[in-house]
UniProtKB/Swiss-Prot annotation:
Domain notes: The presence of a 'disulfide through disulfide knot' structurally defines this protein as a knottin.
Name the record gives this protein: Chlorotoxin-like peptide Bs 8
Annotated organism of origin: Hottentotta tamulus sindicus (Scorpion)
InterPro entries linked: Scorpion_toxin-like_sf, Scorpion_toxinS_Cl_inh
Protein task: Toxin with unknown function in healthy organisms. On glioma cells, interacts with chloride channels (probably ClC-3/CLCN3) and MMP2 at the surface of glioma cells. This complex is then internalized via caveolae, thus inhibiting the chloride channels necessary for cell shrinkage and tumor propagation.
Length: 35
């Protein structure tokens, strides 16, 4: 499960992608990173 995400974090989309295993994967939705 990915860490909580915060839309205020400019690095968040990269963190989401890294957590989800690749570029273009993972979205910051609500407080959670969804893969």
């Amino acid at each position: 499960r990915c860490k909580p995400c915060f839309t205020t974090d400019p690095q968040m989309s990269k963190k989401c992608a890294d957590c989800c295993g690749g570029k273009g994967k993972g979205k910051c939705y609500g407080p959670q990173c969804l893969c």
